[in-house]
Amino acid sequence: MKSYRWLTLSAALGITVLEAWLFTAASASASQIDSHSTDNAADSGQALYSTYCGACHQANGEGMAGAFPPLKGSGVVNRADATKHIDIVLGGLQGVRASGVTYSNAMPAFAATLSDAEIAAIIDYERAAWGNHGSLIGPAQVASERARLN
């Protein structure tokens, strides 16, 4: 009887160790996937920013004096509610005044050029880069705002 008891306890211990190992392996894989997805989204946002925004707002987000406003430290970019930020990217903007400076050059509208996912990636990049701390968004939020504006 004692040998069956030890056998049962050994089997239970073995199963517990196996479950713990499988759980740890699955958690590590999920973590790697999440990290990889986040890295890809950030890379995508940075690449899209470089293509569509960087010439005017510059790679460092500081803009061009008197021509294009900075995104680094921008009130619109750092606002908790991203609606205005989305509206500007979708609809463009001209004659903006920021920090006491008027920027006369026009920003084109990207509603017809970029998808909701691309706009979200750019905005998320801008809201996280250069020390900015705006809340991040997703394609669904861009789609909702696009529908509201149409």
Which positions does each model-derived feature cover?
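Electrostatic cytochrome c docking/interface patches
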Residues: 23-48, 63, 138
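Bacterial N-terminal signal peptides that target proteins for export
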Residues: 2-14
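Hydrophobic alpha-helical membrane-insertion segments, chiefly the h-region
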Residues: 15-23
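Sequence/structural segment immediately N-terminal to covalent heme-attachment motifs in c-type
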Residues: 39-64, 77-91
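N-terminal targeting and processing segments of secreted/endomembrane and organelle-targeted proteins
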Residues: 3-6, 22-26
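Flexible coil segments in periplasmic/lumen-exposed cytochrome c-class electron-transfer proteins
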Residues: 30-36, 97, 101-150
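Short cysteine/histidine-rich zinc-coordinating motifs and their immediately flanking basic loops
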Residues: 65-70
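A short beta-alpha structural unit
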Residues: 72-74
